[in-house]
UniProtKB/Swiss-Prot annotation:
GO terms for molecular function: ribosome binding. Pfam families: PRC_RimM, RimM. The keyword Nuclease does not apply. PANTHER family: RIBOSOME MATURATION FACTOR RIMM. One of its GO terms (biological process) is rRNA processing. InterPro entries: PRC_barrel-like_sf (IPR011033), PRC_RimM (IPR056792), RimM (IPR011961), RimM_N (IPR002676), RimM_N_sf (IPR036976), Transl_B-barrel_sf (IPR009000). One of its GO terms (cellular component) is ribosome. Belongs to the RimM family. The lineage of its organism: Bacteria, Bacillati, Cyanobacteriota, Cyanophyceae, Synechococcales. Residues 100-176 form the PRC barrel domain. The gene is rimM. It comes from Prochlorococcus marinus (strain AS9601). The PRC barrel domain binds ribosomal protein uS19. Binds ribosomal protein uS19. Coiled coil: none annotated. This is Ribosome maturation factor RimM.
Length: 179
C-alpha cells in the first residue's frame, strides 16, 4: 500500500542478475530515470523501515518493464540475494513535475468518489488508499456502510479524475460495490 505523504513504491527487486551484485527490478513507475540515474534511493524489506542505498547504474531490459541495477556496496550474488523482494522507494515529496492534465497516483487519496445515477452525480465514498503492488487499485471507503472496496483504476471504470475539484467518477460493473 501507499501511504500519502511518506513513500512511493516505484519497483520491486525480483531476482539477482549475474554474479557481481546486480539486481533485477520490476518497475511500477513511468519515470525510467528512477532506475537509470545514479543517486540515493531507499530500500524496504517487508515491515522494516526504509534504508538509504546508492544507485550506481542501471539499464532497461529491452521489451520489458525490468531494469538491471547496481547498488554501491552490493558486489556479490550473495549480497544481492539478501535484497530480493525488497521494495524500491522514493520520498513522495520528491515527485516529478507533471503536465497540466496529468497527476500522481498519490493525489487520488482523499478524493470524493461519485457515480452517475439517473443523470445525477451522487457521492458514494472516498479514496482512502491505493494498492499498487501488482495492479493499480483504488481502495474506496463507501459512506453507506463504511465498507472498503477495491476498484481497478482503468479508464472504463474510472472515466474521470478531477484533481482540482477533489473528486473522481466511477462507473463500476454491476456487483463490484457489493463484493
Amino acid at each position: 500500500m501507499i501511504i500519502k505523504n511518506e513513500w512511493l513504491i516505484v519497483g520491486f527487486i525480483t531476482s539477482c542478475h549475474g554474479i557481481n551484485g546486480q539486481l533485477k527490478v520490476k518497475s511500477l513507475s513511468d519515470f525510467e530515470e528512477r532506475f537509470l540515474k545514479p543517486g540515493m534511493r531507499w530500500l524496504q524489506k517487508e515491515s522494516e523501515h526504509p534504508s538509504k542505498i546508492e544507485l550506481i547504474s542501471g539499464f532497461k531490459q529491452p521489451g520489458k518493464e525490468i531494469f538491471i541495477v547496481k547498488f554501491k556496496g552490493i558486489n556479490t550474488r550473495n549480497h544481492a540475494e539478501q535484497l530480493k523482494k525488497c521494495k524500491l522507494l522514493v520520498k513522495s515529496d520528491k515527485l516529478p513535475k507533471l503536465k497540466k492534465e496529468e497527476f500522481h497516483l498519490l493525489e487520488l487519496i482523499d478524493l470524493e468518489v461519485k457515480t452517475l445515477e439517473n443523470d445525477e452525480l451522487k457521492i458514494i465514498g472516498k479514496v482512502i488508499n491505493l494498492e499498487n503492488e501488482k495492479n493499480n487499485l483504488l481502495i474506496i471507503e463507501l459512506f453507506k456502510n463504511q465498507k472498503k472496496v477495491l476498484i481497478p483504476f482503468v479508464k472504463e471504470i474510472v472515466p474521470l479524475v478531477d484533481i482540482k475539484n477533489n473528486f473522481l467518477i466511477i462507473n463500476p460493473p454491476n456487483g463490484l460495490l457489493e463484493l
